Swiss-Prot record:
The lineage of its organism: Bacteria, Pseudomonadati, Pseudomonadota, Gammaproteobacteria, Alteromonadales. It is an enzyme of class 2 (transferase). HAMAP family: Cytidyl_kinase_type1. Keywords: ATP-binding, Cytoplasm, Kinase, Nucleotide-binding, Transferase. One of its GO terms (cellular component) is cytosol. Gene3D superfamilies: P-loop containing nucleotide triphosphate hydrolases (3.40.50.300). It comes from Shewanella halifaxensis (strain HAW-EB4). This is Cytidylate kinase.
C-alpha cells in the first residue's frame, strides 16, 4: 500500500509512553495524530452503551462499521478530544474498564478489519503520527518511519497508577500490574495482529530514559527515514 501523506508509526505495549511521545511528535512536526487505541476504547464504550456483549463478534463488527467517532485537535498541547456520537468521551475511555474491554474487542479479526479502513483514512497532509499496537505491522506497513516503545511491566504499572490517580480513579497498583501482564500475554499471543515490533522499527526501551531523550531518539529516526527538516 502507499500512504497519501508521511506517516510515523508508534507501537508498543500499554504504559510504554506511546501517547506522550506521539503527542510531542505531532506538535513538533505539525502532523495530525491518530490514537488507534482510542478507537477500540470508543468501540468498547459504544458496545457498553448499546448493550452489545464483548464476546459477540458479529454484533461488534456491525457496531464498528457504523461507529460515529471523531478526533478533535487543537487543544493547546492537551491532546486530542475523542467524540463518540457527539459526546466528549476523552476521559471516560481512559478508565480501566474501557482499557480491558478494548483489548478484548480488538482480538476479533472481523472487528479489526472493520476499523482498518477508517484508521488508514487518517493519513492526510501534512502528515500523521499513528499511535497504536499494530500501526507499523498492519495499518501502515509501507512507511519507513516506525517506532516501537517498550518498558518493564512494573514501570508501566507505576505510570498507569499515577495517571489514573491524577484523573481521580481509585486503583490498586498490584491489580494494575496483574492486568498489564495479562494484557501483554493476550496482545502478544493473539492470532491476528499480535503485538510485535515491525522488523524495521526503531525499538526504544523507555524504562530508564527521560521523555526528552526518547523524543530526541525518535526525531532523529524520523528525520533520517522521512527526510523531513530538523
Amino acid at each position: 500500500m502507499s500512504e497519501r501523506a508521511p506517516v510515523v508509526t508508534v507501537d508498543g505495549p500499554s504504559g510504554a509512553g506511546k501517547g506522550t511521545i506521539s503527542q510531542l511528535l505531532a506538535e513538533r512536526l505539525g502532523y495530525k495524530l491518530l490514537d488507534s487505541g482510542a478507537i477500540y476504547r470508543v468501540l468498547a464504550l459504544a458496545a457498553i452503551h448499546h448493550n452489545v456483549e464483548l464476546d459477540n463478534e458479529e454484533s461488534l463488527t456491525l457496531l464498528a462499521a457504523h461507529l460515529d467517532v471523531q478526533f478533535v485537535t487543537g487543544n493547546e498541547g492537551k491532546g486530542i478530544k475523542v467524540v463518540l456520537e457527539g459526546e466528549d468521551v476523552s476521559t471516560t475511555i481512559r478508565s480501566q474498564e474501557c482499557s480491558n474491554a478494548a483489548s478484548k474487542v480488538a482480538a476479533f479479526p472481523r472487528v479489526r478489519e472493520a476499523l482498518l479502513r477508517r484508521q488508514r483514512a487518517f493519513a492526510e497532509a501534512p502528515g500523521l503520527i499513528a499511535d497504536g499496537r499494530d500501526m507499523g505491522t498492519v495499518v501502515f506497513p509501507a512507511t519507513p518511519a516506525k517506532l516501537y516503545l517498550t518498558a518493564t511491566a512494573e514501570e508501566r504499572a507505576q505510570r498507569r497508577y499515577n495517571q489514573l490517580q491524577d484523573k481521580g480513579f481509585d486503583v490498586n497498583i498490584d491489580q494494575l500490574l496483574s492486568e498489564i501482564k495479562e494484557r501483554d500475554d493476550r496482545d502478544m499471543n493473539r492470532s491476528v495482529a499480535p503485538l510485535v515490533p515491525a522488523e524495521d522499527a526503531l525499538i526504544i526501551d523507555t524504562t530508564n530514559i527521560n521523555i526528552e531523550d526518547v523524543l530526541d531518539l525518535a526525531l532523529t529516526h524520523i528525520h533520517q527515514k522521512l527526510q523531513v527538516p530538523a
